[in-house]
């Protein structure tokens, strides 16, 4: 579903220094964007920002970068950041396919992929954020033994993604087909997750470790 463009969204984003429109300037030194050398965690497709805001609030010693393509949802994420006066989050409006242009190798310590588009049609599988063509890029940009945390409500996407991660040499550290009934205690819910779980949908979740061998 495409979001309706809001004319006010872009000016609001452009007026806030936490929104980075030229992220390539920090490719060699993301510490400059935050003013410290704390670890970098990345959320791909941050949506309205509930997840990354709670992460940042709980972990002030970690620098978070939220990426999404749509101004309309990024504005809502940014407002949450400002309401909580968080200083350890930056927002990037961009296509996730361009990640390699803004990060150098071995720079990211964790990636979160929450409820990405499942692209059910086989001819669109290459667009999935867990497809091997994306995973191979993430692996280069991430530090060895760092982790990708992946959540979805889609059974087929989760099943295929388990295979994708294995094909790309990731180590599966954790897997559950019903996150909210599992023993996992570190979960932070997204807006979509609350909606799906209230409808009785089981949330699938996995943790996959980068293994550069």
Curated annotation (Swiss-Prot):
Q: Where does substrate bind?
A: 153, 190-193
Q: Which domain of life is it from?
A: Bacteria
Q: Which residues, by range, are in coiled-coil regions? A: none
The UniProt catalytic activity note for this protein reads:
guanosine(46) in tRNA + S-adenosyl-L-methionine = N(7)-methylguanosine(46) in tRNA + S-adenosyl-L-homocysteine
- Entry-linked SUPFAM superfamilies: S-adenosyl-L-methionine-dependent methyltransferases
Q: Which family, according to UniProt?
A: Belongs to the class I-like SAM-binding methyltransferase superfamily. TrmB family.
What is the recorded name of this protein?
A: tRNA (guanine-N(7)-)-methyltransferase
């Amino acid at each position: 579903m495409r979001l309706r463009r809001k004319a006010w969204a872009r000016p609001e984003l452009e007026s806030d220094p936490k929104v980075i429109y030229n992220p390539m300037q920090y490719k060699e030194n993301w510490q400059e964007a935050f003013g410290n050398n704390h670890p970098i965690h990345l959320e791909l497709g941050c949506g309205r920002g509930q997840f990354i805001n709670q992460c940042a609030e709980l972990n002030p010693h970690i620098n978070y970068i939220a990426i999404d393509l749509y101004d309309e949802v990024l504005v809502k994420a940014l407002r949450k950041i400002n309401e909580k006066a968080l200083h350890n989050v930056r927002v990037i409006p961009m296509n996730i396919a361009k990640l390699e242009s803004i990060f150098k190798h071995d720079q990211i310590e964790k990636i979160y992929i929450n409820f990405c588009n499942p692209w059910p049609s086989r001819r669109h599988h290459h667009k999935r954020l867990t497809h091997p063509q994306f995973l191979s890029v993430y692996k280069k940009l991430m530090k060895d033994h760092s982790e990708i945390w992946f959540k979805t409500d889609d059974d087929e996407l989760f099943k295929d993604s388990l295979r994708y991660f294995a094909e790309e040499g990731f180590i599966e550290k954790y897997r559950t087909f019903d996150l909210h009934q599992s023993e996992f205690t570190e979960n932070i819910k997204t807006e979509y997750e609350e909606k799906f779980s209230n409808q009785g949908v089981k949330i699938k979740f996995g943790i996959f470790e980068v293994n550069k061998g």
